[in-house]
UniProtKB/Swiss-Prot annotation:
Belongs to the metapneumovirus M2-2 protein family. One of its GO terms (biological process) is symbiont-mediated suppression of host cytoplasmic pattern recognition receptor signaling pathway via inhibition of MAVS activity. One of its GO terms (molecular function) is protein sequestering activity. Keywords: Host cytoplasm, Host-virus interaction, Inhibition of host innate immune response by virus, Inhibition of host MAVS by virus, Inhibition of host RLR pathway by virus, Viral immunoevasion, Viral RNA replication. Interacts with host MAVS; this interaction inhibits signaling pathway leading to interferon production. Interacts with host MYD88; this interaction inhibits innate response in dendritic cells. Interacts with TRIM25. Interacts with IRF7. One of its GO terms (cellular component) is cytoplasm. Its main location: host cell. This is Protein M2-2. It comes from the Viruses. Mediates the regulatory switch from transcription to RNA replication. Acts late in infection by inhibiting viral transcription and up-regulating RNA replication. Plays a major role in antagonizing the type I IFN-mediated antiviral response. Interacts with host MAVS and prevents the interaction with its upstream partner RIGI in the signaling pathway leading to interferon production. Inhibits host RIGI signaling by preventing TRIM25-mediated RIGI ubiquitination. It is found in: Host cytoplasm.
Length: 71
């Protein structure tokens, strides 16, 4: 996990128990300053990436890798 706080871009490799790994990129308008805000951005990004179409609900998703940076 590589975190540069504050950040505006987050890349994550996630895995649902039923499917293989999915790579998502999240770009936010406002800076992410805390790990709590980072978790919220990841949750929103997972939902917006339509990963949940494949029955991957947040409680079933494993976050394998996260990279957060400013640009």
């Amino acid at each position: 996990m590589t975190l540069h706080m504050p950040c505006k871009t987050v890349k994550a490799l996630i895995k649902c128990s039923e499917h293989g790994p999915v790579f998502i990129t999240i770009e936010v308008d406002e800076m992410i300053w805390t790990q709590k805000e980072l978790k919220e951005a990841l949750s929103d990004g997972i939902v917006k990436s339509h990963t949940n179409i494949y029955n991957c609900y947040l409680e079933n998703i494993e976050i394998i890798y996260v990279k957060a940076y400013l640009s």
